[in-house]
Amino acid sequence: MNVFLRADSSLSIGSGHIIRCLNLAKALKKAGAHCIFISKNHHGNILGKITQGNFPLKVIPVLDRTGIYVRDEKSWLDGNQSDDAEQFVSLVSESCLFPDIIIVDHYSLDREWETIVKARFPESYLVVIDDLCNRPHCGDLLIDQTYQRTAKEYLNLNGNDGNILAGTKFALIHPIFAQLRNQSVSRKANITLPKKLMLTMGGVDAQNITGKILDFLEQVDFDNIEKITIILGAACPHSAEISTLGKKSKYCVEVLINISNMAELMLEHDFAIGAMGGTTWERCAMGLPAVNIAIADNQRTIANNLAEAGAIVLNAEKFNASELRCALTHLITHYHEQRLLAMNICDGQGLIRVIQEIILIPAKDGINVTLRKASCNDIDFVYQLQCEPKTRQFARNPEIPEYKNHVKWMQSKLDNGNTFFYIIEHDEECGVIRLDPVENSVAKYEISIFLSSSSHGKGIASAAIKRTLMLHNDIVILATVLPENYASHQLFERLGFLKISPSEYIIERK
C-alpha cells in the first residue's frame, strides 16, 4: 500500500501540518504502508523532520524563499492550485508507484486541487485534513480535529456531511501522549500548587510571542514558579534572543530547542502557557492545564470554542502583562478545574481512530470493524459479555465471575501499562479483544477475544484479529485454544497463525 502525503511548513505556515502528517505516516507505516512526502522548500521549513523519520521526500521548488511572515493562508502556497496539482501528479507518476492513498493537509488547497488529482488517480483514496471549514473539498474522507467541530458544518461547503471525522477525538497527535496520559493525570491530581511552568509557542514562532511573554513575566511576580522551561523549534528565528532573555530572567529558565520528548516534558511540568495548534491537544491529552494563546487568525474558532468551554484563552496581539498575570492567577487558583477541563477535551486516541477509518477491515456484511481502548466506563459491558454462555463455554475458567471480582480484575488490566485492552465495534460495541504480556518473554503477548452472542458467525472476530495484527505488527502473538473450540482453531489457522501444540498458535511479526 503506497501513501503520498502533500503538506508544507514555513515561517508563515508553521510546523503543525508536517508534524501531524508525520504522526499519521508513522502509524500507517507501522500498519504496513509505504509513505512518501511531497513538500515545497519554503523558507523556515522543517523538511529535515521528514528525512529524519526515514520517509522518502520529493521537493517542489518554490519561487519566493524570502523570510517574510504572511498572515493570509491563501498566499502560503507560493503559486496556484492547478500548477501545484500538476506538479504533485508529475512527481507521483515519476515514482512508478500507484498511490493507493493520497493525503493532503494544506490551508491553500481545496476542491480545485483535489479535483485535478482525483481525475488523474480516480482509484486512489483521497484523504483531506483541514481545520478551517471555510472552503469546499471533494475527498473520500475529511478529517477536522477542531474542538467541537461537527460534520454538519461542512454541509453547505461540500454539499454533504458524510465521511467526515470531526472533533478532537480525531486529533492526530503522537501515540506517546496516550501512553503517558494516565501517569500524567495521576501526577497532576496530587499537585496543590503548580511550580513548573512550560512555555511553548509552536515550532516556528515567527512573531516571537515567546519573547513577549518572557518580558511580561519579568513585570509580574509569581513566587510559586520554581522553573520555566521554554520549548523552541529548530526553525525558530528568535532562538538566540530568547536564550539571552532566559539567562537574564529573574526566574530559573531553561531553553530547549528541537526536542523529541514533548510528552515526557509535559508529564514533568505542572502548567503551561502555550500556542493554539497541535500542541493544544497534546496538552489536553496529558491533562496539562494552560493559558492558551491564539497566535493566528485561523485559530479564532478554536479559541472561541475553548473559551466558551471555560478554558483560559488570550489573543497574542492584544494581551499585556496585566492580562497575563490575571490569566495565570486564574489558572493557579482554579488549577484542578482547568486540569479536568483539559483532560476531557482530548483523550489522545485520535490517531488509532483515524487509521482504522483509512484502512478498512470489514465483517461479512461490509461494515468496518474497529477497536477502541477500553476504559472504566466499559466495566459493566465487559461483565455482561463475561456472563454469556458462549463466553464461559471456551474460557479457561467456565464459572461466571462475581461482579466485585470482575471489577477488580478489569481495573488491574486497565492499570497495567503493558496490557492492550480493546472494545470491538461493528457499528456498536460488540466484543472484547485483549493482548496480555507473556511472562519472561520480550514483545510476546497472548491474545484473548470474546463477542456478544448476537455477533457470532458474522466475520467480526476475524476482522477484529486482523485489526489487532495491523495495530501491533511488531510483536509476537500467542493464542491458546481449548481442543473442543473447533471454530477458533479454524479461525487462527485461516489468519496465518502457526500451530505449535494441540492448543497453541503463534504468529511472529516483523
Predicted features and spans:
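Conserved nucleotide-sugar phosphate-binding/catalytic loop shared by glycosyltransferases and other
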Residues: 31-86, 317
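A nucleotide-sugar donor-handling region in carbohydrate enzymes
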Residues: 137-208, 238-240
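Donor-nucleotide binding loops and adjacent catalytic segments primarily
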Residues: 182-269
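Acidic donor-binding loop of glycosyltransferase active sites
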Residues: 267-278
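A short, well-ordered alpha-helix in the C-terminal region of glycosyltransferases
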Residues: 336-348
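C-terminal alpha-helical cap of glycosyltransferases
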Residues: 347-367
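Acyl-donor (CoA/ACP) binding surface of acyl/acetyltransferases
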Residues: 365-379, 385-388, 421-423, 427-510
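A short helix-loop-beta-strand connector motif used in the catalytic cores of GNAT acetyltransferases and
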Residues: 410-423
